[in-house]
Curated annotation (Swiss-Prot):
It catalyses: sn-glycerol 3-phosphate + an acyl-CoA = a 1-acyl-sn-glycero-3-phosphate + CoA. It comes from Shewanella baltica (strain OS155 / ATCC BAA-1091). It comes from the Bacteria. The lineage of its organism: Bacteria, Pseudomonadati, Pseudomonadota, Gammaproteobacteria, Alteromonadales. Belongs to the GPAT/DAPAT family. It is found in: Cell inner membrane. It is a peripheral membrane protein. One of its GO terms (molecular function) is glycerol-3-phosphate O-acyltransferase activity. One of its GO terms (biological process) is fatty acid metabolic process. The HXXXXD motif is essential for acyltransferase activity and may constitute the binding site for the phosphate moiety of the glycerol-3-phosphate. Its EC number is 2.3.1.15. A motif (HXXXXD motif) lies at residues 308-313. The gene is plsB. This is Glycerol-3-phosphate acyltransferase.
Length: 807
């Protein structure tokens, strides 16, 4: 290799500086990987390449990593900084042997034998000039831009045409000290290390580019030859008394309606547009947990992303983030309502496949869709779908629609070899464009049909939207889940493949709820959501600025010292910083007062801000319930607080998809936190410290509307034990409307009929709606709920239930 200060390399670096734009994966290798700045470091690359090393040199200078041109000097040892697995491919003839490169591996290992204190980190580095996966029927373009083993001439063309799409990916470091101690330092180990590195680079390329793309028409013909589709076409012909040719044409029409038409060229163009869009809209996008997903891809998992659904922006945001995190954007299941011009064709070429809201018993459509989904899994394409079935209008997670999850489960049961893993994804925003529309719809206005004019209308409103949040939750591997739920599932299916197992539907329901729980476990507590939570807990949606900052400091400390889960993310900075962020986004207003500034939510925005509060209400609902127990009792034993929370938690879990593993332990941790912060003292009982009562009262207010709902339900059950489930839902909803009208409750979810339906299902499951119900339990929970209400609210509920009962 020429010296790094030679005229040739200087010229090459100057050319690349103007032609090449490099994206680093991950963005911060020191934070995301196991790199240790105090230990010597060497790079391992697949192929010796002057242009690759020049590009790497630019990046290492920006990241503060050692330059690939500098020799590795450690403990008196001088070695090359870059180790390659193979030499450059010549324009003509054969590539030289790998012996010189294996010698480098052996030298690095050998010095560890001589110097026991030495530990060199070997960091794999992959470079990609463009990320085209190629096609099954590839053309001359593939020959010109052969990316894996290009000659210098092809590399020049790649830099010229694809230099703006260069990716450099760093991987976790390998300790050569560990390798030397565990496996030795001879040539055999050097060969083994090189083999492992080759496998790593091959897998890494697959993660970055994805599987080859099929020819769409060839894919259709392949699907139509499948056993299940041939059978479905025959049944369609027989049932509708048409020819098989006509039924086949219908199946092709369905495929054309459903199937994606992924275009790498469009994705590259979209990447530029979306970079401009995000920079215009957001001051930053916060990402947590991407490395675990990248590792799942690397380990050969079939990935199914299951995000929550807040906004139409969700379709773009997750794909964009995955692209920049070194993964292939997934094929996205989009509602057929989005298949309008020009968005529909663009979404389709960006990887969207379209699904009808209802299959309406259409067996042929069902068979076509199922076969297409199976094919995506079989070929290794990652998939994304929204299990809620639509965008949440309240900010809370919706009850999951199980159709897509059931189809995914069925694909596993039909024999996918690779592990299929669901990755729950929490998507959050400091500003959701559609919030105002959502509240119009909740108040009875008809939902507008999606159209190009809505797109233009949305573009006109683009502004400062603060930050976005993408948190990847705990993955669920379906084969492991099935082993847990039905240990003999493989044997059962082998014995009778056509028989639907009795455990399948309950297992799908449990899986769907676990996905939603894992989404909420990965929630992002941001400046907007936290400030909304505090201000909406006050009577006038306003608070003195210093008190607001103090309350936010309490919440931030709580989330950090008693973390809800390890997947949850918490805003950086203190309460003062969070308030300032919210004011800069115009979410809140501040007015001067002789005694100090007051921060408030404008009356016209109060209902809209409940959306953001609801994004994270589950993080604080148990601490809020604990605070309510403390503030409504002068003294209360610790165990009584634990018991009250245990009574309400099953309902909270059903309503808010909560995932606290050990509820008593969590309650005790929160109580210990309150004591540590000086809010509460404990002798034989727990007592609130008077000067901190206001902080606990504010926290307690966040659970008040939830307790009012439970008080309505349990007062009705206590007065009318024989009440049917449907009757309980309708009566609870009517009483909620009455309570809201009398006490000014405006939160949309308080009147949500579906919420009362969810609670009634859980009540039946817990035995509170059964004929042999334990009335003492119902009366106890009723009394607990009543004791935690304001007297006026309690009086309204008790009087209304009694009056209704006497009527």
């Amino acid at each position: 290799m020429p010296k790094h200060d030679s005229l040739w390399l200087k010229s090459l670096r100057w050319i690349q500086k103007h032609l090449v734009h490099t994206i680093v994966v991950p963005q911060d290798p020191f934070a995301d990987l196991n790199l240790d700045a105090s230990r010597p470091l060497a790079y391992v690359m697949k192929t010796e390449s002057l242009s690759d090393i020049a590009a790497l040199s630019e990046i290492t200078a920006k990241l503060g990593l050692p330059s690939p041109y500098e020799p590795l000097v450690a403990n008196g040892v001088i070695a090359p900084r870059v180790v390659c697995l193979q030499g450059r491919k010549p324009l003509f003839g054969e590539r030289a042997g790998n012996e010189p490169f294996l010698e480098c591996f052996m030298r690095l290992l050998a010095v560890h034998k001589e110097r026991p204190e030495l530990d060199i980190q070997l960091v794999p580095v992959s470079l990609y000039w463009g990320r085209t996966p190629g096609k099954e029927d590839d053309t001359m373009k593939a020959a010109v831009f052969e990316r894996e083993n290009p000659t210098w001439l092809r590399k020049c063309l790649m830099i010229l045409f694809l230099g703006r799409h260069n990716f450099v990916q760093f991987s976790n470091a390998v300790s050569l000290r560990y390798m030397a101690d565990e496996h030795g330092t001879d040539m055999g180990i050097a060969h083994k290390l090189a083999r492992v590195a080759r496998v790593h680079f091959r897998r890494q390329r697959k993660v970055m580019t994805g599987p080859v793309l099929p020819n769409r028409q060839a894919l259709f013909h392949s699907l139509l030859k499948s056993e299940s589709l041939r059978k479905a076409i025959q049944e369609e012909a027989a049932n509708k008394k048409i020819s098989e040719t006509q039924a086949r044409e219908t199946a092709i029409e369905y495929l054309d309606e459903i199937a994606a038409d992924y275009s790498d060229s469009l994705v590259r163009i979209a990447e530029r547009f979306l970079t401009w869009l995000w920079n215009k809209l957001y001051s930053g996008i916060n990402i947590k947990g991407a490395e675990q997903v990248r590792q799942l891809h690397h380990d050969g998992h079939e990935i199914v992303y299951v995000p929550c659904h807040r906004s139409h922006m969700d379709y773009l945001l997750l794909s964009y983030i995955l692209y920049y995190q070194g993964m292939v954007p997934p094929h996205i299941a989009a509602g057929i309502n989005l298949n309008f011009w020009p968005a529909g064709p663009m979404f389709r070429r960006g990887g969207a496949f379209f699904i009808r809201r209802s299959f309406n018993g259409n067996k042929l459509y069902t068979a076509v869709f199922r076969e297409y989904l199976d094919q995506l899994f079989a070929k290794g394409y990652s998939v994304e779908y929204f299990s809620e079935g639509g965008r949440s209008r309240t900010g809370r997670l919706l009850a999951p629609k199980t159709g897509m999850i059931a189809m995914t489960m069925n694909s596993v049961l039909r024999g996918i070899e690779r592990p299929v893993t669901l990755v729950p994804v929490y998507l959050g925003y400091d500003h959701v464009m559609e919030v105002a529309t959502y509240h119009k719809e909740l108040s009875g206005k008809k939902k507008k049909k999606e159209s190009v004019w809505q797109v233009f209308g949305a573009i006109r409103k683009l502004g400062n939207f603060g930050q976005g949040y993408v948190n990847f939750g705990e993955p669920i591997t379906l084969q492991n889940f099935l082993n847990e739920r039905a240990p003999n599932w493989r044997t059962e299916l082998a014995d009778d493949p056509e028989q639907k197992p009795s455990w399948l539907t309950p297992a799908v329901n449990v899986l769907a709820n676990r996905v939603m729980t894992n989404i909420n476990d990965a929630a992002a507590a941001s400046s907007v959501t936290l400030t909304s939570l505090v201000l909406l807990a006050t009577d006038q949606n306003a608070l003195e600025r210093s008190l607001l900052e103090r309350q936010l400091d309490l919440y931030l400390t709580l989330l950090k010292k008693v973390p809800y889960t390890t997947y949850t993310s918490v805003a950086e900075g203190d309460g003062k910083h969070l308030v300032q962020q919210g004011l800069e986004l115009n979410k809140f207003v501040v007015c001067a007062d002789p005694l100090g500034e007051i921060v408030s939510i404008e009356a016209s925005q109060a209902v809209s801000m409940t959306y953001y509060r609801n994004n994270i209400i589950h993080l604080f609902i148990v601490p809020s319930l604990i605070a309510s127990c403390l503030t409504h009792n002068k003294q209360i034993p610790r165990q009584q607080v634990v018991s009250i929370v245990a009574d309400f938690y099953p309902l909270l879990k059903a309503e808010l998809f909560m995932g606290i593993k050990d509820v008593p332990a969590y309650v005790n941790q929160v109580l210990d936190f309150f004591i540590e912060q000086g809010l509460v003292v404990e002798t034989d009982t727990l007592t609130v410290v008077p000067e901190h009562t206001s902080q606990l009262l504010l926290l307690a207010s966040s659970v008040s509307e939830t307790l009012q709902r439970y008080a309505i339900i349990f007062n009705l059950l206590a007065n009318r034990p024989k009440m049917e489930r449907s009757e309980l839902e309708s009566e609870s909803h009517l009483l909620a409307q009455r309570l809201g009208a009398l006490h000014g409750i405006t939160a949309p979810e308080f009147y949500d009929k579906k919420l009362y339906g969810t609670l009634s299902v859980k009540l039946k499951e817990l035995g509170y709606l059964a004929d042999n119900q334990d009335k003492s339990n119902i009366n106890r929970i009723r009394d607990q709920a009543n004791s935690l209400l304001r007297p006026s609210v309690k009086q309204t509920i008790v009087a209304s239930v009694t009056a209704e009962h006497t009527v």
